[in-house]
Amino acid sequence: MASSVLSSAAVATRSNVAQANMVAPFTGLKSAASFPVSRKQNLDITSIASNGGRVQCMQVWPPINKKKYETLSYLPDLSVEQLLSEIEYLLKNGWVPCLEFETEHGFVYREHHKSPGYYDGRYWTMWKLPMFGCTDATQVLAEVEEAKKAYPQAWIRIIGFDNVRQVQCISFIAYKPEGY
């Protein structure tokens, strides 16, 4: 009798260890453990396929008639106040404002180079010289208005150049021609 009790205890211990090591199947990014469950759990992993729960809200960018110009170019055009705010941010960081314009291709295209990336075939023309020593955002906005008068069918962007590290730190579209 003692041997049967011992063997049944050993078997019971082994089954508890096996149950403790079992891992629930992955059901996406949402954890069901934190919510009370009022229905019976279905442990059949073939019926609980999921793409991750939170992924349901993602959408595909429509490529037709949606040209990409710069970072955040999918947002509506910036108002004058928003432009001034961006320019003040640029100046506050010590970057040199510079205006550039493009009369033909304001969007990404591949003409001379086929690989994607920063060198995407766009070479913009600089408007005058970089505005070294500029401390007023309205001066930059006045230059944008002057460039708009000179080239009304051009895309105009403002870039912030860090002359210490010699890199472009910010770039955004300040003006797009009608119809874009």
Curated annotation (Swiss-Prot):
Pfam family, one: RbcS
SUPFAM superfamilies per the UniProt record, alphabetical: RuBisCO, small subunit
GO biological process, one term: reductive pentose-phosphate cycle
GO cellular component terms attached to this protein's record: chloroplast; plasmodesma; viral replication complex
Entry-linked InterPro entries: RuBisCO_ssu, RuBisCO_ssu_dom, RuBisCO_ssu_N, RuBisCO_ssu_sf
UniProt KW Plastid keyword: yes
Effect of gene knockout: In susceptible plants, increased tomato mosaic tobamovirus (ToMV) induced necrosis in inoculated leaves but delayed development of systemic viral symptoms. ToMV is able to establish efficient local infection but not to move systemically. Compromised Tm-2(2)-dependent resistance.
Alphabetized UniProt keyword annotations: Antiviral defense, Calvin cycle, Carbon dioxide fixation, Cell junction, Chloroplast, Photorespiration, Photosynthesis, Plastid, Transit peptide
GO terms assigned for molecular function: ribulose-bisphosphate carboxylase activity
Compartments in which it is found: Plastid, Chloroplast; Cell junction, Plasmodesma
Superkingdom of source: Eukaryota
Transit peptide: 1-56
Family: Belongs to the RuBisCO small chain family.
Purpose: RuBisCO catalyzes two reactions: the carboxylation of D-ribulose 1,5-bisphosphate, the primary event in carbon dioxide fixation, as well as the oxidative fragmentation of the pentose substrate. Both reactions occur simultaneously and in competition at the same active site. Although the small subunit is not catalytic it is essential for maximal activity. Involved in antiviral defenses.
Remarks, miscellaneous: The basic functional RuBisCO is composed of a large chain homodimer in a 'head-to-tail' conformation. In form I RuBisCO this homodimer is arranged in a barrel-like tetramer with the small subunits forming a tetrameric 'cap' on each end of the 'barrel'.
Protein name (Swiss-Prot/TrEMBL): Ribulose bisphosphate carboxylase small subunit, chloroplastic
Lineage: Eukaryota, Viridiplantae, Streptophyta, Embryophyta, Tracheophyta
Protein's gene: rbcS
